[in-house]
Amino acid sequence: MAFWAMTVVIAPVVGPVLGGYITEEYSWHWIFYINVPIGLFCAYSIATLLKGRESKTTKQPIDIIGLTLLVIGVGSLQFMLEHANDLGWFESHEVIILTIFAVVGLVLLTIWEWYERNAVVDLHLLRSRNFAIGVSLQTIGFTIFFGNMVVMPLWLQTVMGYDSFHSGLAVAPVAVFSVLFSPVIGMNMHKVDLRYLVITGFALFAFGSWYSSLLTPDATMSDIMIGRFLFGLGIPFFFIPLGALIMEGLHGEELTHAAGLSNFLRTLGGAIGTAVFVTLWTRRTIFHHARLTENAVPGTPAYDQLMNQLGHAGMNSTQRYTLLDGLISQQAATQSTLDILYLTGVLFLVMIIFVFFAKPVKGASATGGH
């Protein structure tokens, strides 16, 4: 479980750093080309290392209807989330149509899978209280987590002037604590109630979010990296105990179905978090830009002082207004970023309340089915 948590976290952290380096030194095309040798190597490794270890297979009827509804519902949702911000969300007919397809497809999928004997998605796992609570916390928590993670590179590249490599480098410390302490937590979580570990994770996420929400456009890379490191303190307390809590009381094929469903919902949560928080960041930037512009008018002390200073520096009116708009845009994007970081911190604290709905369980009993 600890090793799994490290791979889950390291990938999205190393990705921006490596991707940024490749983009800066070569071209963005190589971000895709590099997957070809990696994919071939992984395929060869799996075929070689797992040879002779095939799982027991049985012939089962394929849930064609359920699979079709899953593709329609989730496919429409993913496509809508990916393009909604560019299309103006529900001002676009395409987004509305995709939303209808997603809602209808997922509702019909839920109804069908509940009564289907050979369901492609085993919804009966939700009868397990800890699975239902745990997978909900994981999905919503990962949505907030990704929202927090995605706005920082946006701010660094649009306001702070970082290139893609250095913005990835600035957020990389988020994984340091996870790599070092995930094995420690994995080996010792049988000693405490898993719920308290999850609560610790949410509390640390909230603290790291709050710290980063105090940054300014004058922040150094060290300031940013410290904030990301503090945020990363919560990662091993979140992923590992929550994964064990989800699997508590499940056995045999239930574990396979539970792992598949929880991984799918976690990925979906990340996609939702990216789409929603990028849109929120954009709209809050527009909001703050409008508010700041309202106060940047002749007659206000700050405006008059700045215009006089720029005039004495030899700038004409066009240059002065261009510089002023740039300063307003910088402050608006910064304030929008800080708003989202603060919001995610509050949401993480709210998540703590729902942890108590899960049944008390220690790590030893939770992992007994593995």
Where are these regions (language model features)?
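Short, hydrophobic transmembrane alpha-helix segments
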Residues: 83-89
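Hydrophobic/small/kink-forming positions within alpha-helical transmembrane segments
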Residues: 9, 13, 71, 176-180, ...
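Small-residue-rich alpha-helical segments with characteristic i,i+4
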Residues: 10-20, 24-25, 224-304
